[in-house]
Amino acid sequence: EACLVGSEMCIRDRCVIPKLLSRNKDENTLVHRTVRTHGMGESFLAEIIKDWEDNLSADEIKLAYLPSPGIVKLRLSLVGKDGKKIVDTLNKHIDLLYEIIPDQVYGYEDDTMEGVVGDLLTAQNASISTAESCTGGAVAKMITSVSGSSNYFEGSVICYSNICKINQLHVQESALHGYGAVSQEVVEQMAIGVKRKLNTDYGLATSGIAGPTGGTAEKPVGTIWLSLIHISEPTRHAS
């Protein structure tokens, strides 16, 4: 969003905004709906939903891509005189979008990832703990930024050294030597270890190479492994 200098702000506040408000009040209503997605870059997302996006023009809906690290917000905008009809039209297209990318949509409007996760854990009456290496407590910070997170978040173990992983999370030394600290095998053992150590339903672990040094040809800077363990579900991991 562009920054405005004083004179531009004055023109905006005294002329532009009152004119827009008057026009909307007397003639039309502008409604925005925002869909929040994750796990897919902007260009790839645009390719996947191209046909859906093309169909928006039939209802005169405008679409804006609003990317940020790890997240792409899709803002749908529609102008009209009938507010209810506008909302119904937008919701119809949002429902169609969800059918295309159900695994990527995590929320709407002002939802946050950490807030949605907290709601899901609360609904399940479940608890979670984290074991962090490359993220250095950042995951725990996100989770605990939500009011009431103490109801489902037990704690975090930050382990950077191999010794810490062995002593605190019971990671097997053979796995560290055989696969390296940044590997599926090790991050899975970290998740299991913290879940057992803190007695939670879920264990979430991260390990990676944050840089700027430490990368190799096989594991370049930016390589990250994540593992999520649950008491009744198979291991989930991603890199």
Feature-to-residue mapping (PLM):
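Extended hydrophobic
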Residues: 64, 196, 201-228, 232
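Accessory alpha-helical/coil subdomains and C-terminal extensions
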Residues: 8, 12-70, 75-77, 85-90
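Gly/His-enriched, cation/cofactor- and phosphate-binding structural elements
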Residues: 73-127
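Short glycine-rich anion-binding loops that position phosphate/pyrophosphate groups of nucleotides
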Residues: 7, 71, 208-212
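Single conserved hydrophobic/aromatic residue that forms the stacking wall/gate
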Residues: 1-6, 11, 229-239
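Glycine-rich, small/polar surface segments that engage phosphate groups of diverse ligands
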Residues: 129-182
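Residue-level signal for inorganic ion chemistry
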Residues: 76, 132, 143, 204, ...
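Ligand-binding beta-strand-loop-alpha-helix segment within the catalytic cores
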Residues: 180-194
